[in-house]
């Protein structure tokens, strides 16, 4: 059976910090995705999120309809506890991708990226 799933990536954060502003943008993705396919969601930062400790402070969240956001990926590519290996994160200092393989109906929701380098 083929079912069409809707994914939505959105603009997440404009964070003011002492070193200047970091603007995080996501391309809106609302194209239908067929169950079993793969989908990529991109996120871009106006500044590098590679911190002086060598870690990249970029998180990915999924907010399913009627639920609170769930952490999927932290430090750019580390899956949170209990998150399926169908979810993977990758990227560089400013450009990031969340890849979802073998999409399922339960993956429907709003996907957010978040930076943790600067705080308001």
From Swiss-Prot:
- Covalent S-S links between cysteines: 43-113
Please name the InterPro entries in this protein's record: Ig-like_dom, Ig-like_dom_sf, Ig-like_fold, Ig_V-set, IgV_Light_Chain
Region of interest: Framework-3: 82-113
GO biological process terms on file: adaptive immune response
Region Framework-2, annotated ranges: 60-74
Indicate the secretion signal residues.
1-20
Q: Looking at the record, which segments are called Complementarity-determining-3? A: 114-120
What Gene Ontology cellular-component terms does the record carry?
Answer: immunoglobulin complex
The record's region (Framework-1) falls at: 21-43
* Keywords in alphabetical order: Adaptive immunity, Disulfide bond, Immunity, Immunoglobulin, Signal
Q: Where is this region: Complementarity-determining-1?
A: 44-59
Quote the protein name from its UniProt record.
Immunoglobulin kappa variable 2-112
- Species source reads Mus musculus (Mouse)
Taxonomically, what lineage is the organism? Eukaryota, Metazoa, Chordata, Craniata, Vertebrata
